[in-house]
């Protein structure tokens, strides 16, 4: 965040502290696989994928037939999304949203680059676009007609629980812990990961967690054109619908990077923007001088606020990651302390009494009172819900605030998912790939995204 100055315009540079808001300005890293690699058989279904907590076993690549049959209708995994020329449905919807956008906020333009370089960007200190990366703005001006971002839990002494960057192939230990404690969370899924690791995505949904969008390729959204912003969100929604059968109505911008232009496109897709109030920096351990002890201290800082009166009127929404084995393990270590310090730990839909979390009206998220009574699963219902159930009815004083699979790998150092991906053992990973529809054998073509720092 850049301090306010008297200047009307501010030139942003990549080296400024501003570039390190939220996720430290880190970039998605890529590596070469050094040649083709063949898969053999491993997990066969969701249940078998959920058994092992050995990272090498969990992250063995597999082919999931429903994904291989539809992969050609999606953007290339881990590349910037765009609308294919033959997707007339997407083109028509984008045209409608874009027309509204250009009418309401024509002067809100892209900032910087998709990797977070703002060198030479001129932006007014008055923050006309409510640009979170500039000043952590979460409440657009009234004339935009945009809703405020969700950034706190409105109920007192309540931890809003969510995990970014999933599904991760090595998440079984974390999900086992959540299951054993009847604990639900909001999972912010990357579209490329959903198609890479569909069985892992299915576990999250089937065990009653809320699923939200975290874009297709995890880039700084305010740097992207209107069409690319739309495609990054739209095709992630579509991937989640294709694999899980539900259409999310919530999203979190990578790095927190959002402004009114991006918000308006998201709202055109019925997506509510969710940010956070507290950052554990779990993603940063081992980089930029950040130690594992620093991450533990960050967790402890949030826990300490529960004891000093900070959360008597509301609670935090905390940034955690399903990114690496470490980010998941440190949460597991701190979970008993979190439970002891806070009265409640809930997913975001529950915190805001959003009982219809998806476009599909027969799926219900328990409201706050129901959840704390012990009924925690997001589940199907035979009773149809109308759109009014998505209204925020939180009671805290903070409420006004804001099918089978085949696979394996000869080499345990390589992991990947159903779309033909490979990456590091504990990675939220993906790659460009293709599958032989006759033999079910995948051939890595390259472009791997390893277990890298995503927010």
Curated annotation (Swiss-Prot):
Its cofactor is Co(2+). Acetate binds at residues 164, 255. Disruption phenotype: Triple knockout of CDA1, CDA2 and CDA3 results in an absence of cell wall chitosan, melanization of surrounding media, an increase in capsule size, sensitivity to cell wall (sodium dodecyl sulfate), osmotic (NaCl) and heat stress, and avirulence in a mouse intranasal infection model. It is found in: Secreted; Secreted, Cell wall; Cell membrane. Keywords: Carbohydrate metabolism, Cell membrane, Cell wall, Cell wall biogenesis/degradation, Chitin degradation, Chitin-binding, Cobalt, Glycoprotein, GPI-anchor, Hydrolase, Lipoprotein, Membrane, Metal-binding, Polysaccharide degradation, Secreted, Signal. Coiled coil: none annotated. A lipid is attached at residue 429 (GPI-anchor amidated serine). It catalyses: [(1->4)-N-acetyl-beta-D-glucosaminyl](n) + n H2O = chitosan + n acetate. One of its GO terms (cellular component) is fungal-type cell wall. It is an enzyme of class 3 (hydrolase). Residues 157-347 form the NodB homology domain. This is Chitin deacetylase 2. It comes from Cryptococcus neoformans var. grubii serotype A (strain H99 / ATCC 208821 / CBS 10515 / FGSC 9487).
């Amino acid at each position: 965040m850049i301090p306010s100055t008297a200047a009307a315009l501010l030139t942003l540079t990549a080296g400024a502290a501003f570039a390190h808001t939220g996720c430290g300005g880190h970039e998605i890293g890529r590596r070469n696989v050094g040649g083709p690699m063949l898969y053999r058989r491993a997990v066969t279904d969701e249940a078998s994928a959920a058994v092992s907590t050995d990272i090498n076993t969990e992250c063995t690549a597999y082919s999931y037939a429903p994904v291989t049959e539809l992969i050609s209708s999606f953007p290339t995994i881990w590349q910037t999304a765009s609308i294919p020329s033959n997707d007339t449905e997407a083109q028509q919807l984008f045209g409608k949203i874009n027309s509204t956008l250009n009418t309401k906020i024509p002067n809100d333009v892209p900032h910087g680059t998709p990797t977070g370089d703002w060198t030479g960007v001129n932006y007014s200190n008055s923050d006309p676009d409510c640009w979170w990366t500039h000043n952590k703005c979460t409440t657009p001006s009234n004339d935009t007609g945009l809703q405020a971002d969700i950034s706190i839990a409105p109920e007192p002494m309540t931890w809003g629980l969510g995990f970014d960057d999933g599904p991760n192939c090595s998440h079984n230990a974390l999900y086992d812990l959540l299951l054993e404690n009847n604990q639900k969370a909001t999972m912010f899924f990357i579209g490329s990961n959903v198609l890479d690791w569909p069985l892992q995505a299915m576990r999250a949904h089937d065990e009653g967690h809320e699923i939200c969008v975290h874009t297709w390729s995890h880039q700084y959204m305010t740097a992207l054109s209107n069409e690319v912003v739309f495609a990054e969100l739209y095709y992630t929604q579509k991937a989640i619908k294709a694999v899980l059968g539900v259409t999310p109505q919530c999203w979190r911008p990578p790095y927190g990077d959002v402004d009114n232009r991006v918000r308006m496109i998201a709202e055109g897709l019925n997506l509510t923007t969710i940010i956070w109030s507290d950052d554990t920096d779990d993603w940063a351990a081992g980089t930029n001088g950040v130690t594992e002890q620093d991450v533990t201290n960050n967790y402890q800082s949030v826990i300490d606020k529960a004891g000093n009166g900070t959360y008597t009127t509301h609670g935090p929404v905390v940034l955690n990651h399903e990114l690496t084995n470490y980010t998941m393990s440190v949460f597991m270590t701190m979970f008993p302390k979190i439970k002891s310090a806070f009265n409640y730990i809930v997913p975001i839909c529950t915190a805001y009494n959003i009982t219809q979390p998806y476009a599909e009206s027969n799926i219900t998220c328990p409201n706050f009172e129901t959840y704390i009574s012990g009924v925690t699963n997001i589940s199907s219902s035979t009773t149809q819900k109308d759109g009014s159930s998505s209204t925020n009815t939180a009671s805290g004083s903070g409420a006004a605030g804001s099918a089978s699979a085949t696979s394996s790998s000869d080499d345990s150092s390589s992991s990947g998912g159903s779309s033909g991906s490979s990456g590091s053992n504990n990675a939220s990973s993906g790659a460009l790939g293709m599958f032989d529809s006759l033999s079910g054998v995948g051939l890595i073509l390259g472009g791997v995204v390893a277990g890298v720092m995503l927010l």
